[in-house]
């Protein structure tokens, strides 16, 4: 899975928040699930402007169908008309069709200028089926009528501004990714345009069946791990597998352990600030539980989503360099294993700027997580954890691509120290993890760094069930923007919180994790980078359960201090951020 660093840094560097009084409005990132990405669209009937009756299934022979909401009166729609005309002409040969939908009842669309099918949706049927909210909004359907992208065409035009050319081509990038068999890096944005009131037409509801609804929920939220070759203990890619595991699915979803996401939910009426939020939407959760409690209808196989292809090669493309641990590590069948630490030399005689990185275990099924540190040549890497990691791997998240102008520095002569946590699964095996790097073509404008807010001097008393430890960086001497947060503790970790303190003493919570789970070393990646003014402070607080109420506690009778193994503890609040690079062009 590719992390969306490119999208987050470039596509939304100039957006405004919902609370911003600035009247200018550019596309903003949305959570795909909340935007309806991954949902099945029923086979809605329509009559086009030429008087020809049709259905959405008329486009099933197309690889992709763009459903573009537009009209002839909205200024933004007028500006985007040439782009849509080019789109339907240039992408037709690639198997992409375009359906134009005009939701404005009083509009006179006769001179619209498009060659594709054009529907004047006066009764709001199509508008209701898609839930369109703007005249400039586009939807991309695959051949199974699954929404794969929803949002803006690009960011050239918005409310109160116009650019000479787009900075980010959201729609074209999504189409390119989808035709290449990839999930779009950005699959949902807002679409500034002329606002649409909710359609008075009642949307045609798809029957609650496995093929029409549940299969997509599982595919979108569980498929990355619960598939053949995935890290999960069982697959969920067929009806029979889902039915066979229905009790476990219900239990883990009800408890909030699946899908794995442990940030506190946003306040009512607010949206999650994290681009990789894995929380099930309320509608997905409701439908999943309703189906599990019913006779679990399978439905029509014609309504099934397309099978998802998972890449077997490098997600970052061909690396410029690969580094692999020298010898395979034997992973036993039972019990637990301590962290394995292995260093690999790089031997570069100059600093390297890394624009993309990917960590690839050869036995993913037993790898809990990997942290890679860049340490001085020949060093044992003592204390490296507190300095910040270079790259990371957790199941479902193993690669990171930065956009042009952003990169991490790999100091000359560094060793790459792999810290690998294995979880035996009943079968003995071996692993020989490696990392691939893609180098920037020139010194970047911005350097991406990782640091840790830490307090290594803590002592957790025996039996303490809610021991609090606080670490801080009281004064940050430069301006920065935070990309992601990554709390790290071991099996006694209970909860965590990040706060930013401004010069005037105001404290803002950046992330709260009320139930930390060592089994999932998650990064929390912001949809929009968080500005950190010079002079601000960062506070990281962690709570620990060293009592017998913690079933993962190896020994409640022991006082616990900092240490590298899971029976020790750590207190690390990793922060990924970027700053201007000295001497960059």
Predicted regions and their residues:
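A short beta-strand-turn-helix
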Residues: 44-65, 203-212
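Structural microenvironment flanking redox-active thiols in thiol-disulfide oxidoreductases
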Residues: 78-113, 119-129
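Short active-site neighborhood of thiol/selenol oxidoreductases, capturing the structured segment around
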Residues: 59-78, 175
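N-proximal helix/coil linker or "cap" segments that precede and/or mark the start of modular domains
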Residues: 19-43, 185-187, 191-204
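Thiol/selenol-based redox catalytic cores and closely related redox-interacting motifs
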Residues: 121-197
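His-enriched metal-coordination microenvironments in redox/metal-binding proteins
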Residues: 133, 313-585
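Aromatic- and Gly/Pro-enriched helix-to-coil junctions and flexible linker segments
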Residues: 188-348, 360, 413-419, 424-426
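Aromatic-flanked redox-active Cys/Sec active sites in thiol-based oxidoreductases
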Residues: 68-74, 103, 218-220, 227
């Amino acid at each position: 899975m590719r992390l969306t660093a490119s999208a987050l840094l470039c596509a939304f560097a100039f957006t405004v928040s919902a609370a911003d009084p600035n009247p200018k409005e550019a596309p903003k990132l949305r959570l795909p699930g909340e935007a309806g990405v991954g949902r099945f669209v029923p086979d809605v009937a329509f009559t086009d402007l030429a008087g020809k009756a049709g259905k959405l299934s008329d486009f099933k022979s197309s690889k992709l169908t763009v459903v573009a909401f537009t009209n002839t009166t909205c200024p933004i729609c007028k500006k985007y008309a040439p782009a849509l005309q080019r789109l339907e002409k240039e992408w037709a040969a690639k198997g992409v069709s375009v359906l134009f939908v005009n939701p404005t009842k009083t509009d006179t669309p006769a001179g619209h200028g498009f060659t594709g099918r054009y529907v004047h949706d006066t009764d709001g049927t199509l508008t209701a089926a898609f839930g369109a909210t703007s005249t400039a909004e586009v939807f991309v359907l695959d051949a199974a009528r699954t929404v794969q992208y929803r949002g803006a065409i690009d960011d050239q035009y918005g409310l109160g501004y116009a650019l000479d050319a787009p900075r980010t081509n959201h729609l074209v990038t999504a189409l390119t990714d989808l035709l290449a068999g990839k999930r779009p890096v950005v699959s949902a944005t807002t679409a500034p345009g002329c606002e649409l009131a909710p359609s008075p037409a009642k949307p045609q509801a798809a029957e609650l069946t496995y093929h029409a609804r549940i299969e997509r929920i599982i595919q979108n939220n569980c498929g990355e791990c619960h598939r053949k070759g995935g890290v999960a203990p069982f697959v969920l890619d067929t009806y029979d597998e889902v039915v066979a595991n229905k009790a476990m699915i219900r239990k883990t979803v009800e408890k909030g352990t699946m899908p794995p996401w442990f940030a506190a939910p946003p306040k009512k009426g607010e949206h999650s600030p994290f681009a990789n939020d894995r929380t099930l939407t309320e509608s997905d959760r409701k439908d999943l539980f309703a189906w599990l409690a019913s006779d679990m209808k399978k439905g029509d196989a014609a309504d099934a989503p397309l099978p998802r292809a998972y890449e077997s090669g490098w997600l970052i493309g061909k690396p410029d360099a690969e580094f692999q641990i020298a010898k395979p590590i034997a992973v036993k069948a039972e019990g637990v294993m301590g962290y394995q630490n292995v260093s690999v030399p790089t031997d570069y005689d100059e600093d390297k700027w890394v624009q993309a990185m990917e960590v690839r275990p050869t036995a993913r099924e037993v790898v809990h997580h990997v942290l890679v540190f860049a340490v001085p040549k020949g060093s044992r890497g003592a204390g490296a954890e507190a300095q910040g990691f270079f790259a990371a791997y957790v199941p479902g998240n193993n690669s990171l691509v930065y956009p042009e102008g952003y990169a991490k520095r790999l100091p000359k002569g560094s060793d790459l120290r792999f810290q690998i946590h294995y979880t035996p699964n009943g079968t003995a095996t071996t692993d020989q993890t490696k990392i691939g790097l893609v180098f920037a073509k020139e010194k970047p404008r911005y350097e991406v760094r990782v640091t840790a807010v830490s307090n290594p001097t803590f002592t957790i008393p025996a039996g303490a069930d809610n021991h609090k430890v606080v670490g801080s960086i009281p004064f940050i001497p430069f301006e920065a923007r935070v990309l992601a947060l990554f709390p790290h503790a071991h099996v006694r970790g209970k909860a965590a919180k990040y706060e930013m303190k401004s010069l005037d003493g105001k404290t803002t919570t950046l992330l709260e994790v009320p139930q930390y789970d060592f089994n999932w070393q998650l990064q929390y990646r912001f949809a929009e980078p968080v500005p950190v003014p010079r002079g601000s402070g960062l506070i990281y607080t962690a709570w620990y359960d060293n009592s017998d109420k913690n079933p993962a506690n190896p020994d409640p009778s022991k006082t616990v201090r900092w240490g590298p193994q899971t029976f020790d503890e750590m207190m690390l609040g990793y922060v990924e951020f970027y700053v201007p690079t000295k001497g960059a062009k």
